[in-house]
């Protein structure tokens, strides 16, 4: 899978999402639950806004000194016996991982959840050279078996219910029991256990890399990442270059923010800090590789969008987004959905595929308020719109013509006078009382579900002129 998850046009994807009543119900229920849990977990701290400010400061400081911390991380991983590869592009990252697999004659690979491996199409790259790649995160495994893309950063199978999951297992894996989550989890655990034991390579993502120790931190609720790191003889960790913290102290803060914001827990079931195996340790990989992926992040770092790199992938913004609630994750056409995806996807994937996403927002600001590291997401969406129109020149032709006509009318006193007199007459067939209740063209989509005020028949200038004559102040 690559970053782009659909070849359908944006409007078609949105239409599919709106028509999927089950998906919208599942998303609404999940958003409500996750939102409530996040508020409870935040209230336990008592000073949530101070923690957010601290998280923002840590992320900004790290990004401002990213070159230093990346070099420090690389040196410390190397000192501990690991191999570090800096990949400028997604192709370089995928090729390096392919080469490691070839040298190890690997045929079986097990991996834990990782957004950046999806971004670089890693599974496809390994399958090209004959490797079987198995997802070990339960949600990702469900989607892999069903050949279905993720719809959420933290809960990738959010759009499926337990009956649908049972049917997938029944059809693809020969599952014969009920749709009880415990029974299905037990079945998958037994199925995956052999995959862990047989794999020559284990591949993980990285929630945070600690510069001064050369350690990686993984946050999970299933423990699968721990098995991926400890059983296969070769481990490959893949991380975006921005996923850095200077020391364990900063890690402590950000892990707390991540767990509370993502799932409403003080900590997830497993928070693992590891790296290359040391002499005194009895388990872990014999060979360790860290792949640090740029793939456009350097350009973002030097742009007006650099704040998006503060993201810790908690999905708190997704869990409060009204647009996501109504259209679902697949409508975004990217592995990164929701507000964070609407900002990040055009930067990583380009405007050709994702130019509509910055407009898929009500600009209510709920995402900005929810973000634990205070990314001004709605402001960044507005910046995208500005770039699309002013720098890219990608505004639709109808919009360009409409704005041109408005500009001409608004900048000419004579045209403005004529237009203000003609507007009530032109809209009268579509007006009931003082409201426009039905429209034509682009107005039709608006008036199908709402009304807007009709232009006043009496212009302000005429009213003012009349009252001025009468001396009415």
UniProtKB/Swiss-Prot annotation:
Stated role: Is involved in L-lactate degradation and allows cells to grow with lactate as the sole carbon source. Has probably a role as an electron transporter during oxidation of L-lactate.
Binding site for [4Fe-4S] cluster 1: 311, 314, 317, 371
Organism: Bacillus cytotoxicus (strain DSM 22905 / CIP 110041 / 391-98 / NVH 391-98)
Keywords in alphabetical order: 4Fe-4S, Electron transport, Iron, Iron-sulfur, Metal-binding, Repeat, Transport
UniProt-recorded name of the protein: Lactate utilization protein B
Positions of [4Fe-4S] cluster 2 binding: 321, 364, 367
Domain 4Fe-4S ferredoxin-type positions: 302-332, 351-380
Similarity comment: Belongs to the LutB/YkgF family.
PROSITE patterns from the UniProt entry: 4FE4S_FER_1 (PS00198)
Molecular function GO terms recorded: 4 iron, 4 sulfur cluster binding; metal ion binding
Gene field: lutB
Superkingdom of the source species: Bacteria
């Amino acid at each position: 899978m690559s970053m782009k998850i659909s070849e359908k046009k944006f409007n078609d994807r949105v239409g599919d999402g709106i028509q999927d009543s089950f998906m919208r119900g599942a998303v609404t229920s999940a958003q409500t639950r996750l939102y409530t849990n996040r508020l409870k977990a935040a209230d336990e701290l008592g000073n949530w806004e101070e923690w957010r400010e601290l998280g923002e400061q840590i992320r900004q400081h790290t990004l401002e000194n990213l070159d230093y911390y990346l070099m420090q991380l690389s040196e410390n991983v190397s000192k501990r016996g690991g191999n570090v590869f800096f990949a400028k592009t997604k192709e370089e990252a995928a090729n390096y991982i392919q080469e490691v697999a070839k040298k190890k004659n690997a045929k079986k690979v097990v991996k834990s959840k990782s957004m950046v491996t999806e971004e670089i199409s890693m599974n496809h790259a390994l399958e090209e050279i004959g490797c079987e790649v198995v997802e070990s995160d339960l949600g990702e495994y469900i989607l892999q078996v069903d050949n279905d893309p993720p719809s959420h950063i933290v809960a990738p199978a959010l759009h499926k219910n337990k009956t649908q999951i049972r049917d997938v297992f029944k059809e693809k894996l020969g599952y014969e029991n009920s749709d009880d989550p415990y029974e299905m989890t037990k079945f998958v655990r037994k199925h995956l256990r052999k995959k862990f034991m047989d794999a020559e390579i284990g591949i993980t993502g990285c929630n945070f890399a600690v510069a001064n120790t050369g350690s990686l931190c993984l946050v999970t609720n299933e423990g699968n990442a721990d098995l991926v790191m400890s059983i296969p003889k070769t481990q490959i960790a893949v991380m975006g270059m921005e996923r850095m913290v200077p020391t364990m102290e900063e890690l402590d803060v950000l892990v707390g923010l991540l767990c509370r914001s993502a799932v409403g827990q003080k900590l997830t079931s497993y928070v693992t800090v590891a790296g290359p195996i040391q002499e005194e340790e009895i388990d872990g990989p014999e060979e360790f590789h860290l792949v640090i992926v740029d793939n456009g992040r350097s350009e973002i770092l030097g742009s007006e969008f650099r704040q998006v790199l503060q993201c810790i992938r908690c999905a708190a913004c997704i869990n409060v987004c009204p647009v996501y609630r109504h259209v679902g994750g697949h409508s975004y056409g990217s592995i990164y959905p929701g507000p964070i995806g609407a900002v990040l996807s055009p930067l990583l994937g380009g405007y050709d595929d994702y130019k509509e996403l910055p407009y898929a927002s009500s600009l209510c600001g709920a995402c900005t308020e929810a973000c634990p590291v205070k990314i001004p997401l709605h402001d960044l969406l507005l910046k995208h719109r500005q770039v699309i129109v002013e720098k890219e020149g990608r505004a639709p032709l109808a919009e360009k013509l409409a704005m041109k006509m408005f500009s001409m009318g608004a900048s000419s006193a004579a045209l403005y006078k004529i237009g203000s007199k003609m507007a009530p007459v032109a809209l009268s067939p579509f007006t009931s009382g003082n409201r426009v209740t039905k429209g034509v063209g682009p107005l039709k989509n608006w008036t199908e579900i709402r009304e807007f005020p009709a232009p006043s028949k009496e212009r302000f200038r005429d009213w003012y002129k009349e009252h001025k004559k009468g001396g009415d102040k």
